[in-house]
Amino acid sequence: MAHMDFPFYTPKDAFPVGGAVRDLLLGRRPTDLDYAALDPEKAAEEAKRRLGGSLFPLDPKRGHYRLVVGERTLDFTPLEGRLEEDLLRRDYRVNALLWKGGAVFGLKGVEEDLRRRLLVPVREENLYQDHLRSLRGVRLAATLGFGLPRRTREALGRHARFLQAHPEALPARERVKEELARLLLSPRAAFGLRLLERVGLLGVYLPELALLVGLHQGGVHHLPAWEHTLSAVFHLLWLWPEAPLEARLAALFHDVGKPLTRRFDPEVGRFRFLGHAEVGAEIARASLFWLRFPKEVVERVAGLVRRHMDRLPEERKALRRFFLRRQDLLPDLVYLMAADRLATRGVEREAWEVLGRYEEVLKDPLPQRPLLSGEEVMALLGLQEGPEVGRALKALLEAQAEGRVGTKEEARAFLLYWRGGREAQASGTPDHPH
């Protein structure tokens, strides 16, 4: 194959392999480096002396070591047998590459795979040596923009059916989470999710979402539920290419509650999904916790799913109050609501209204904190520490967002007025106007 200089530090008796070599041949800059070494531990220690970073064993019995230097990861594994034998143990031909002495070595057919941008397993049985490899194949297709020829799709499908029948063979959930996150963070996330479903892996790793496949919706929905979900993911990234993982997960899970809430309403003559956002939030929370996503990610996604059906009020003060109460979910919620509408026939105009009205609110930024502290509120209203202080601060912040309060003096006057209304309600007198 090609002759080239490897542009990264390489320890003695270690050879760059796999994705880093592939990426260089594709004109991409590798983020992580893999090395096959005669003595992986020795090579990893040599790299640490040269580069610094943190070294730790991944699997010392098998000779797997990892060095983390800044944002780059260097993995060291044993060079097993002769060169060709080592390459034959790898997952896909485009990953069965090794750099040695200024030359790149690969298996027969890899040059055509790279030229045609196709993903082909080295051998189908290799998928069963590490059961994450089928999911990794879908992720690679999405991140690299590679196609899956029929033989690959069929091999992945057989492996998916094996995993369905043998759940004990499933990879560690942390590894599954990493592959799914990398797939979703790809610009081609919707394409990758479609492949995941087509080869049968959606039901293996995300069975809650597999229930959306073929689910008829009707009404304004011209697409079945799964196709609508893919369209929402696509439109989210079209509107917001740098969308964070939480927003992408929310787009993926936003309608996951529909299969459990689908009911035919004879009054309107179609199916309805009342409460699907609330049900979906709990399903998303359970699914993502099972996959070992961090708690802060899970809670944000659940909040976005729960709120994605909220309607924007017409009146300006109410609109600012609406966004203030959901400030912790912004801007993700706005883009999710817009993407959901763009994936639905007949309400596309609402997507631009959502974005436009949010942009209008941003011209006068929402307040980040109340003008008075908790201690000042307690002193002013004669309160002890407790939930009433929090309610007072919340009311003050909303008044600031609405434009009714702009100074500390106005804040004090507002809170005294607010307390009068609370006392009037408690005593049973007519409701205070505020």
Swiss-Prot record:
- NCBIfam families per UniProt: HDIG
Give this protein's Gene Ontology molecular function annotations: CC tRNA cytidylyltransferase activity; metal ion binding; nucleotide binding; tRNA binding
Q: Which GO terms describe its biological process?
A: tRNA processing
Protein name in the entry: CC-adding tRNA nucleotidyltransferase
Return the similarity comment: Belongs to the tRNA nucleotidyltransferase/poly(A) polymerase family.
Q: What is its EC number?
A: 2.7.7.-
The cofactor named in the record is: Mg(2+)
Q: Where does Mg(2+) bind?
A: 32, 34
State the organism named in the record.
Thermus thermophilus (strain ATCC BAA-163 / DSM 7039 / HB27)
Q: Which CDD domains match?
A: HDc
User: Where CTP is bound, by residue?
Assistant: 19-22, 90-91, 95, 130-139, 175
